Amino acid sequence: MQFFTDSNMQFPLVELSLNQGETVFIQRGSMVYHTPNVTLSTKLNASGSGLGRFVKAVGRSMVSGESSFITQVISQSNNGYIALAPDSPGQVIPLYLGEKQYRLNDGAFLALDGTAYYTMELESVGKALFGGQGGFFVMTTQGQGTLLANAYGSIKKIELNNQEVTIDNAHVVAWSQTLDYNIHLENGFWQSIGTGEGVVNTFRGTGEIYVQSLNLQTFAGLLNRYLPKRS
């Protein structure tokens, strides 16, 4: 899978170029346009088979908020093209999977190729109890290939070398699996209410963290001020 973005667009689409037989999985609803030699089909977003697979996909969707389905894209010949739009305006980056593997927060997945795949990792209740981002699951990558991750706003890469950093959880996009992490409230419940900082991620070790410049929860709260109130 080769991918391109148009630098002239403020919020660019991502165009994928596919060879014959090449398969890509994309976020459901992200397709904007494609060439006639590209076909799309819906797959259950879970491993296994039969009814058990369906129940697993639906159950995971109910708990994590992730869709029960994922879209499979196959090019029937060379020079197949498909354009994708993330569900939030912002930067899209590639994560190359193989020697490096990552975890992703909710809403960061856009596309995946090769033999790469992801699973949803169940967090402890203590980690996720107050989490508005990440839910009870985080995406955990495996295999070889390229994963496209999208953000709300711009993405900054932070590299740790046997160090520690605490980041607002709503700004976290992805991080290396080599890092230890702990999702918790900043300075306890009442201090978090007072400072407005809320849920944070503390990372320790050596690896990469990708953070987004904007906070979707904060923007939603801003919009809510201007929405008509129900009587």
Residue ranges and their predicted role:
Residues 1-231:
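Phosphate/adenylate-binding glycine loop and adjacent helical scaffold
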